[in-house]
Amino acid sequence: ERPAHLRQHRGPAAEQGFVVHGTMADPRWLDPTIDPNDRKPNWSFMGDPRMVNDAPAGLARFCTLRSWLSQWSYDLSGANGPACAKRISVPALVVGNTADDGCTPSHTNRIYEAIASSDKTKQLIQGATHYYFGQPDKLAAAVATVDGWLKERDFWD
């Protein structure tokens, strides 16, 4: 009934915000043997997962009804990477970081495998974390990877 109410009563006060707790509750950040890569144990791209799980800021922490449905709803979410990747028919580059503390290897592989394009490439940046904090050499390697891929296809000169 709430979505119907929102459709009828549009305007600045139609949406009501709320906080979603526990959005970093992923056992992979505590146990590096689950979906293993080179990431640091007991760590996520936002810090200690036991702390950031209920911190004031986080992954989709503040929501409205519509944004929650888009991000978290099992049936209605538009945030399904592999399903969206099936619609990619143009050349695609997927860059994975081997110490990624935000996207594990299964994420990278599912996206890459789902891409429909016959021209798809997956490249790994050894030892790189999610945001490359304190890793200027890894960031440079990622930029060089993208630059080279674009130049190979004459997308960039």
Residue ranges and their predicted role:
Residues P82, P105-N109, A140:
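Short, surface-exposed alpha-helical segments at coil->helix boundaries
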Residues A92, K120:
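Hydrophobic anchor at the start of a short beta-strand
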Residues Q126-D157:
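Catalytic active-site module of serine/aspartate enzymes centered on a nucleophile-bearing elbow/loop
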Residues I88, V94-G96, D100:
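Short beta-strand/loop motif that positions the catalytic acidic residue
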Residues K122-L124:
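Conserved beta-strand scaffold positions in the cores of enzyme catalytic domains, especially
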Residues A85-I88, A114-S117:
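Short, conserved loop/helix-junction motifs that constitute active-site signature segments
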Residues S77, D101-H107:
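Conserved alpha/beta-hydrolase "acid-adjacent" motif
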